[in-house]
Amino acid sequence: MICLGLVVDPKGRKASKSRGNVLDPNYLFDNFGSDAVRWYFFTSTQVGENYRTGTDTLRETVQQFFIPLWNCYSFFVTYARLDNFDPSQAQVPLNERHVLDRWLLSRLAWLVGAVGQGLEHYDAVEPARRIHRFVNDDLSNWYIRRSRRRFWKSQSDTDKAAAYQTLHQALMTVSQLLAPFAPYTADSIYRNLCGTSVHLSDWPDPPQTFDLAVETNMKLARDAVVGGLAARDSERMKVRQPLASAAIPGHPLPEEIAAIVREELNVKRLTFDAPQVQLDTTITDDLRLEGIARDIVRALQELRKKKGFEPQDRVRIRFAAPVFDQLLRAIERHTDYIQTEVLATTFEHVSQHLPLTEPDFDLIEVRGEKFPVWITRA
């Protein structure tokens, strides 16, 4: 027997016309979508408890799950179209894929098993929440964020193909798992990926991609990143500023995973078996210049966005020399890095007097110093 709670307003009061807290279902469907309403009722509370429902709670449902899911799908489609990705091409063997691919497919296999088992036991709440956590924590905030460069790079190699195949498989499988909960969203994603309805597909079996060692090491890595970022925050040290080293708890990680931790914490060297995360916060001149270069990249990325460039657009950049000596030294030493990060085919240093003759420029500010930049589509 399943007993459902009542639908009440956000303050826990029963709906009443006299209170003016009655929600019109058609209004909710029109403004948030029927899938969002369904998903809210599946995930917001345990069966038997009351559902505190309002426009704010449904808006949060859309923002916290459907937008991140659609962003993952949109990211894949954007780059798959640019590279003419063909899902029918030969699959890259699992043992030849990047550790992030192997980790995500292991997490996906676990998710398929957990969701299927939960539904077989008439539990819809925890399976839906597991899908939510997978999409947000594993797929969006870790796999795609850590793999962006693999999709961005211009050369089409085995690693890029493996990234496409992994993300394609994850989106297809998530759509199948999502179908009983959010049928319209699931069908839209699945149909656009393979041309048929998700509701005509078989329920997925857990893929044989479990890798306990990779999952265990990746969890240690992610925990270390959380601790390291907290340590940076307590030291008021921006992540863009490189540091010489960090010591983290736990056993030594495989190099392919340790490299991820170094990049996330922006440190040059990583040691292990520390009682807690410890950072070397001594800033040498070389580290300072590299940090300035990263600040320049951020300013240029914001300018790209402001000017309406797409993520894949190549650009030409000219800049007038800043007065601040360290800025100019950072640019000269890290030109290749800056160019690569902002997809600039050219990065040209021009005369300070050019703004007088070519006024169509933008000012960017880096560490309190402003200087003019010209950016055009290549």
Q: What are the roles of these predicted feature ranges?
A:
Residues E49-L58:
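Short, solvent-exposed helix-loop connector elements
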Residues W39-Y40:
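Non-catalytic, structured segments within soluble enzyme domains
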